[in-house]
Amino acid sequence: QAKNSIALRSGDLAAIDLYARRGWVHDGTLAELKTHLVADHIADLEAGRNSIVLASTTNDVRELNSAIQSIRRSENAARTDRVIGLSDQHMAGVGDQVVTRSNDRGPGGRTKGGTRPGSYVRNGDVWTVVKVHRDKSLTVRHRDHKGTVRLSAQYVREHTELGYAMTIHRAQGLTVDVTRM
């Protein structure tokens, strides 16, 4: 697969054959493909897999994040009784997946519990919202090491986005079970 991705990157279209044989290439209209992408991602989350959706533009990311969040809310996987505005203009509630967009090495940016207590909040980390506080701060649990941290209202407003979908560049460095594009 590694050799194949290098061949594909260099323009060798025969490299697509491996992906097609494995059932990783799908055709359809853009709307159909996005619908399947969202459904497959939701199935990943329901199965407990760390999954991310990658898109080439921020507009596609915004659209995919909205679609995924809407389905999760309709299935009660993300709550709407108390929500908070994020830096990407989305609203997040308990159960939503968010991504932090700035490092926070201050005392308030250190995690508690999990397998890496004391880790700082990093740009690109993926979290699940566990509590929305009255002061508009969020308590979040790290997707991988399970540590929790309370993000200040200002940090949430300026540096936190929905984290179901990301641009390819923004997702660099993430380790997941499933990547959907």
How would you name each of these model-derived features?
Residues 104-181:
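Conserved helicase C-terminal RecA-like lobe
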